[in-house]
Amino acid sequence: MRTENTATLNLIWGALILEELARLGVQHVCMAPGSRSTPLTLAAAQQTKLQRHLHFDERGLGFMALGLAKASRAPVAIITTSGTAVANLYPAIVEAWLTHVPLIVLSGDRPPELLGCGANQAIVQPGIFANYATQVNLPTPDAHIAPQALLTTVDEAVANQTRPVHINCMYREPLYPSELSGVILDTESPYLKPLQTWLQLARPYTQYGKCKQLSSPSDDAIMRFVHGKGVIVVGTLTPEQDPQQLIALSQKIGWPLLTDAQSQLRQHPAAIGNIDQLLQHPRARNLLQEADRVLVFGGRLLSKRVIGYLAEQNWHSYWQVLPEQDRLDPSHNAKHIWHANAEQFAALNWYRSSSANWANTLITYNDELHNLFVRNIDQGEFGEAQVIRAIANTRPLEQQLFIGNSLPVRLYDMYAPVSCCTATTYTNRGASGIDGLLATACGIAAHKGKATSLIIGDLSQLHDLNSLAIAKGLTSPLVIVILNNDGGNIFNLLPVPNEQVRSDYYRLSHGLEFGYAAAMFNLPYNQVDNLADFQDSYNEALDFQGASIIEVNVSQNQASDQIAALNLWVKQS
């Protein structure tokens, strides 16, 4: 391929970047239309190693990429044009950075001479994501810059990266080649002559090795640590960390396993899942206050009561295990932080505690709460908690569950039922925003091809209405369960000093339903007001090969009134 003209060299650079990313483990590329990113777009269109996903809204596109990366546990590339298109990725990049999800942004940009002079669609893109991405600024393609310099730059930026990378790609016009035929990375090209060996192989140009040594305590340290009354608290764990190993660890030491909604163990029968509620139970709380040792796996705990318990307790020893170099200790109590995966740490040489089974009575208290929830939620008034418990009990091994922020994830954390197994569970709890939740769930569903359920509030769904266009293109089941309580009713749980202020400035009632939105995107839709109809609609949707919507309409105060009543019963237990 001849390389004299700018459009051709632009295209070659785009193809080199995409080819190297594929060799570095990228499986998916998410693309939004735009002119300045044309060299990347045309290269991606011919790249057979990547699955392409297209969407017109960059904010939703970024969250879809986040979901794909969460599900695949591999980096995902995103291609956007210049200007505010890049800025629209910011919320997804923030979430990805905080939760160690590798996204690679490839942003088309104007050349240097068109920046800061009033040229159209030109903003300062380098550093646009501030502290939330590793930044790489590529020059405009130049035949005097060796192609291997481009490859080594990409390799250094992406290799072993567990967080977002922003590669800003400047291109001069013309952007469109006169024709698009043949192989872009032509072995006969004089410009590519230094890459002849690389072109014939399938590995990255530069391979970075990483000798990761497990950060682990000594046998003596373990023996001293378990010599007392302790608890194991499990926060956010990704599915591949094999949290089942923590069940065995709990049983070996003889300490109770207290599990968060994001632990992949919230519903496990061997875990104490109702910890948020047990901390309101007088006898259970008194018992838990006897603990003087704690082993915390993961971070970003959901329950304020659990966070408060960890902060207020006078711990003799506080160990935390994190898979990455992170600071996830808002109570500032952790005395030892070990960097290891949960299953690696659980496989160490642990000893039976001298106070094994000291808190076995928690099982009885946990069972009391289970019976209370069956009577007052499952057999009570139709509402949000009842729907969430029904979803959590339905075919968990066959599906994966994405739980939306605000009220849904808290209801799941407080009231999820004990089950023989738990669906693989996902959340966006890095920055805990209510934007992009549907798009993230679409990305998860698109990668796995497995039935996926999304539990989402009405305001969250309104935030991400555009992403119904992504959902429309899915070929695997995605059940979008919208809990419509007409506004931000999590604020019913917060001490807003005046009911009128709560209504006018926090709850923001809208009076909207989602039937017309479903019709606009040609998605199956059901509206239900009782458990039997919900269960029928839900089972039907799990078997539908595509996305569908179930809208659950409840009164504004239903969930908050039920929570208040249940809290009162628990406190009087």
From Swiss-Prot:
Its cofactor is Mg(2+); Mn(2+); thiamine diphosphate. The keyword Secreted does not apply. Signal peptide: none annotated. Binds 1 thiamine pyrophosphate per subunit. It holds the Pfam family TPP_enzyme_M_2. Gene3D superfamilies: 3.40.50.970, TPP-binding domain (3.40.50.1220). InterPro entries: DHS-like_NAD/FAD-binding_dom (IPR029035), MenaQ_synth_MenD (IPR004433), MenD_middle (IPR032264), THDP-binding (IPR029061), Thiamin_PyroP_enz_TPP-bd_dom (IPR012001), TPP_enzyme_TPP-bd (IPR011766). Belongs to the TPP enzyme family. MenD subfamily. Catalyzes the thiamine diphosphate-dependent decarboxylation of 2-oxoglutarate and the subsequent addition of the resulting succinic semialdehyde-thiamine pyrophosphate anion to isochorismate to yield 2-succinyl-5-enolpyruvyl-6-hydroxy-3-cyclohexene-1-carboxylate (SEPHCHC). Homodimer. PANTHER family: 2-SUCCINYL-5-ENOLPYRUVYL-6-HYDROXY-3-CYCLOHEXENE-1-CARBOXYLATE SYNTHASE (PTHR42916), PROTEIN PHYLLO, CHLOROPLASTIC (PTHR42916:SF1). This is 2-succinyl-5-enolpyruvyl-6-hydroxy-3-cyclohexene-1-carboxylate synthase.
